[in-house]
Design a protein with these regions (language model features):
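Ferredoxin-type iron-sulfur electron-transfer modules and their immediate structural context
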Residues: 1-109, 114-115, 122-177
Length: 177
């Protein structure tokens, strides 16, 4: 496991309900908690987790903004960056919207072990799938799917690929729109 010793010796015991086994000497002297430790707290508590339908997405970012656990992330990347990050044919992307993102791909990835299944992302999603007649349906770009072992195994490599993608150059983002 890649987790730091503090996470293994203290945080993990607390999460497992074994806090009484933590030695006083293992606790920080000044009471401060190390930063970035939540990245190791994969609880998988949701019965259902959100999934993304790229073709229905309008790339507004509401889902990422409203997610209380920060497990819905968005990125824009070049096809080359996607290849370098290890994206395969199952990694979902769609052409990015906006002239500043010409020839780039947009992706949303959900960290399924962090999702609590609250459905806030689905309720704020304005993106709708289109039916055979070309009209919008009630099906949204984000939807809930049962959090099975198969789903977790399918999505884990996608999350790893997503994290390997570079962050978008902030100069490309027009904050005035």
């Amino acid at each position: 496991d890649e987790a730091p010793d503090f996470v293994k010796q203290v945080t993990a015991k607390m999460m497992e309900g074994r806090g009484e086994q933590i030695k006083v000497s293992e606790m920080p002297d000044d009471g401060r908690w190390p930063t970035a430790t939540t990245q190791w707290e994969k609880r998988n508590i949701a019965v259902q987790v959100s999934q993304w339908e790229p073709e229905a997405c309008i790339q507004c970012g509401r889902c990422s903004l409203v997610c209380p656990h920060g497990c819905i992330r968005m990125k824009v990347a070049t096809p080359e960056a996607l290849r370098e990050a290890g994206a395969d044919s199952t990694f979902k992307t769609v052409d990015a919207i906006g002239k500043e993102f010409k020839d780039m791909k947009f992706t949303i990835q959900v960290s399924t072990p962090d999702c609590c299944g609250c459905t806030l992302c689905v309720s704020v999603c304005p993106g709708r799938k289109k039916g055979a007649d070309g009209k919008k349906t009630e099906e949204r770009a984000l939807f809930m799917e049962t959090n099975t072992q198969e789903l977790r195994e399918r999505e884990a490599p996608h999350w790893k690929t997503f994290l390997a993608l570079p962050e978008v150059d902030e100069k490309l983002i027009n904050v005035g729109t």
